[in-house]
A protein has these predicted regions:
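Flexible, compositionally biased loop and terminal segments
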Residues: 1-241
């Protein structure tokens, strides 16, 4: 959700006006995702690096997020949307943490779509913490499935109450062409769509266009293109000891 501040500055408005407009855009895209039968949607609301912004802006963002959560709980319940806030919680205001936990509990039965919101989130921190805290007695390790054990630790560290799995499509607004420390592990084979539109102006039409673009792509996950697979026998993956 990139470009809120620049959207406001272009209009001679304070940055907080851009963040408020961005919250309205988030609601539109959540509704569009639910209508499009998207199983899981993750919004990058506040990165760990965002703490370096001016104190007044950070305070406004946290207040806005708290109000947004409180206002959206009933809407999520009505529409079968399950909320999960991922990221660190030890640096958040205790009152906000309580509201997060309440929102997750009240929406836990939602089955239509999983909505994850990343707050105080850093993918590099998540990977580093998980590597450090992976349980050496994890049964997955003895079975040779180190990745499953690591991913379980990753989910615990980031308060991911529901495993969302790998990211299929990453959409970034605001004209930037980089991942910015977002879901680096989960985006290993994600398709990327970058748009110049600032987040407050990002529309349902652009969201649906990105989904259509994704549907037209051939995803190989390291394999050969379809044409080559049809003419060559499938090679067995090498075994390393």
């Amino acid at each position: 959700m990139d470009g809120n501040g620049r959207w406001a500055e272009q209009r001679g408005l304070p940055r907080r006006a851009g963040h408020r407009a961005g919250a309205k855009s988030a609601r539109r895209i959540i509704e569009a995702a639910a209508r499009s039968s998207v199983d899981s949607l993750t919004l990058y609301a506040f990165s760990s690096d965002n703490w370096s912004r001016p104190r007044e802006e950070v305070s406004h963002l946290m207040h806005l997020f708290k109000r947004y959560l409180q206002s959206e709980i009933s809407r999520c319940i009505e529409n079968g949307i399950r909320l999960n806030i991922i990221g660190r919680r030890d640096r958040l205001n205790p009152e906000l943490v309580k509201i997060i936990e309440q929102a997750e509990t009240l929406t836990a039965d939602g089955e239509r779509m999983l909505l994850r919101v990343a707050v105080d989130y850093s993918a590099r921190d998540a990977v580093a913490f998980s590597a450090h805290y992976t349980d050496p007695n994890c049964t997955c390790l003895s079975g040779g499935n180190e990745r499953a054990c690591f991913e379980a630790a990753l989910a615990r560290q980031m308060h991911a109450s529901v495993p969302a799995g790998d990211v299929d499509l990453l959409i970034r607004s605001g004209g930037e062409r980089r991942l910015s420390d977002f879901l680096l592990w989960e985006c290993a084979y994600a398709e990327l769509v970058f748009v110049d539109t600032y987040w407050p102006d990002f529309s349902e039409h652009e969201f649906e266009a990105a989904l259509k673009d994704f549907d037209g792509r051939e995803r190989r996950f390291g394999g050969a293109p379809v044409a080559e697979r049809s003419t060559h026998p499938q090679a067995e993956a090498p075994h390393y000891q």
